[in-house]
């Protein structure tokens, strides 16, 4: 990316996708009407995604020293004007300042949650006020079409009063295990 062409940079690590098939009717009730629910082979997905964020910076700053945090988001998959993306129901993190900035400047539904991640070789345990998840990861694998539908998303959508807001999210393709 050219300097100045981005608003915020972050490093994401220890990221997991836990995916669930969800009914269209249940999702339609809680996703803003301007967003079209996106499906893969007729199935609608909701994902829980815990991860660690670090090295947050803005175009005019180095990485902020206090920018390491744990996060857990609950998301679904949508399109807006033909562009596929993510809609977040909630984004929990253990960093009050980051939550304030994300809520007030990016209109994202962040809330505070006490969170911890413990890692022991290939075993991970993620605890928050709202969830407790344990994982054991294996070898990396080749992505199938459903994996690509879920992980190869480069836009997020949120709503501020009457307006749909779109943010581009640039990242390398995720390596899955």
Ranges and model annotations:
Residues 73-177:
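Internal, well-folded beta-alpha domain core
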Residues 40-44, 53-92, 96:
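A glycine-rich, hydrophobic loop/mini-helix early in the fold
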Residues 47, 54-56, 65, 103-107, ...:
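Short, charged/polar low-complexity linear motifs in solvent-exposed/disordered segments
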Residues 1-59:
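Hydrophobic, proline/glycine-rich low-complexity stretches
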